[in-house]
Swiss-Prot record:
This is Large ribosomal subunit protein uL22. HAMAP family: Ribosomal_uL22_B. This protein binds specifically to 23S rRNA; its binding is stimulated by other ribosomal proteins, e.g. L4, L17, and L20. It is important during the early stages of 50S assembly. It makes multiple contacts with different domains of the 23S rRNA in the assembled 50S subunit and ribosome. It comes from Macrococcus caseolyticus (strain JCSC5402) (Macrococcoides caseolyticum). GO terms for cellular component: cytosolic large ribosomal subunit. It comes from the Bacteria. One of its GO terms (biological process) is translation. Part of the 50S ribosomal subunit. Transmembrane segments: none annotated. One of its GO terms (molecular function) is structural constituent of ribosome. The lineage of its organism: Bacteria, Bacillati, Bacillota, Bacilli, Bacillales. Keywords: Ribonucleoprotein, Ribosomal protein, RNA-binding, rRNA-binding.
């Protein structure tokens, strides 16, 4: 079972958000929250809030146990770009692209390895 949360049109470039998401992907939820609290990036509070939202969705909508969840997926896609212009010398202008992100976090139950799957992995 899995639950997800999506934040759309967040005014941080996806390239910068991905740096933070890479830190928490595959981690247990408690560990991911601890990492986000100590990460000094502008997107950390946004990602932390989104992770808490995914946890609330898991608990409320699916009656999942929060203590046994891991961050299954975490990705940032590009949202709409705000195009602005900066005046330059001699009447020219330079384009400024203010990029936005659509951030998605999926939490799921830990996969418990059974002895059968372990035997199959050892056989490979």
């Amino acid at each position: 079972m899995e639950a997800k949360a999506v934040a759309r049109t967040i005014r941080i470039a996806p390239r910068k958000v991905r740096l933070v998401l890479d830190l928490i992907r595959g981690k247990e939820v408690a560990e991911a929250i601890a990492i986000l609290k100590l990460t000094n990036k502008a997107s950390s509070p946004v990602v932390e809030k989104l992770l808490m939202s995914a946890l609330a969705n898991a608990e409320h909508n699916y009656d999942m146990n929060i203590d046994s969840l891991v961050v299954k997926e975490a990705y940032a896609n590009e949202g709409p770009t705000l195009k602005r212009f900066r005046p330059r010398a001699q009447g020219r202008a330079s384009a400024i692209n203010k990029r936005t992100s659509h951030i998605t976090i999926v939490v799921a139950d830990k996969e418990v390895k059974t002895s059968n799957t372990e035997a199959q992995e050892e056989a490979k």
